[in-house]
Amino acid sequence: MSARKRTAAIVGVYNTRQGRRLDGETSRSLALEAVHGALDDAGIELDSVDGITSGELSTTLIYDLRLGPAWQGFGFGLGMITEAAAAIENGLAEAVVLVAAQAGEYREHEATAPWTRPENEFVASWGMFTAAEFALIARRHMHVYGTTREQLSIVAATIRNNGARNPEAVYYQRGPFVPDDITASRPIADPFHLLDCATTSEGGCALVVANVEKFDVARPPVYVLGSGFDFYGPSYQHPPAWDLTGRSGTDPNGVVGRRAADLAFAHAGLDRDEVDVLELYDPFSFEIIRQLEAFRFCPDGDGGPFVADGHIAIDGSHPVTTDGGTMSFSHAGTNPQMMQRAIRAVQQLRGTAGPLQVPDAHIALCSNGGAGAMFTTVLLLGDQPR
């Protein structure tokens, strides 16, 4: 007879200071700070940790923190959380730290960002840089459905205004913004202007996923209810065509994440109208409109009017990216920015999101990726197990 699965939950979260440039810090120093901060938040001792996921830093941190022998995960972004929860539920670990950080690795902005290498350095020189890849998807949607430039600006202004009210954001008190401010910034890749795009910054973060039946944790647990993962290929190597499909011929890259969202909701046993807050990944303004459609919060082609009607505002029916996201809160490399969607969701579900708290938040949806990167991942979190 197989052993009964244990209950895994996110029990600790921590963001280091985020900044455009954190002089005196390294990726390793920020990672160590984040580990200790998340464990303190969870009320779990370092001696109890028997698993870690931190990309290329994983084995370094296992050695530095004397965690071995320990389980090591290999996921990235939101996938780190699903992987850790599965490891705990199946007896491979009891307490797993997920950590990511970046400082001092991207200060020569004439070069491609290190987290897009080696792929982007071979295509960016021909004009296919990240903004252009996402712009291709946006322009196609605008052509087919009539999505307007103003609707993109509403998304960017909404998220940047969230960041302006978040004391932990890199761009705290930068704002408020109105849609005209977005198009007044310099053009980057049609239809995007500078303020449609993610910033670049430095910082670190960590989460603790643990067996809640074993630990007396300090904070209310947040449970993984469902997840889904859609990939169409490697990011930043090929033009991200809207119509790209796999052998099944269904759900083209333009709606990548639809299958992932359907799976996540099926696993969770939830309907879309039960979600209280959407911590959507926001590399560029249009990606929010695309995800709202792909995840079936509105019909295809209705994403633009949906945001124009105020649904994504902090006091709207579907508040999005409530910390300011990669546009305003932080964008410190591949894993920090992606993990921070889940960290913000945990803060909302705990009721600790400060001036940007969504009232009575019990269910949150998080996302990573986008059609320009040819993948989208989805995670549903709740303040109660299901």
Q: What residue spans do the PLM features occupy?
A:
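Conserved active-site "lid/cap" helical segment
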Residues: M1-E83, A87, H141-T148, V170-Y171, ...
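Condensing-enzyme catalytic core mediating Claisen C-C bond formation in acyl metabolism
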Residues: M1-R28, I154, P187-V255, R259, ...
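Conserved catalytic cysteine-centered active-site region
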Residues: R4-K5, G51-E133, Q173-C197, D230-P234, ...
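Acidic, glycine-rich active-site loops and adjacent beta-strand->loop/helix elements
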Residues: N15-R17, G55-S58, F76-G77, A100-E105, ...
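Beta-strand segments within the central parallel beta-sheet cores of soluble alpha/beta enzyme folds
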Residues: L46-G55, V96-A101, E150-T158, R219-F229, ...
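Short glycine/threonine-rich loop-to-helix capping motif typified by GTGT followed
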Residues: S58-L65, Y236-P240, D282-P305, G316, ...
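Active-site-proximal alpha-helical scaffold in enzymes
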Residues: G73-Q102, W115, A131-E168, L207-K214, ...
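C-terminal catalytic subdomain
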Residues: T245-F306, S317-T322, M339, I343
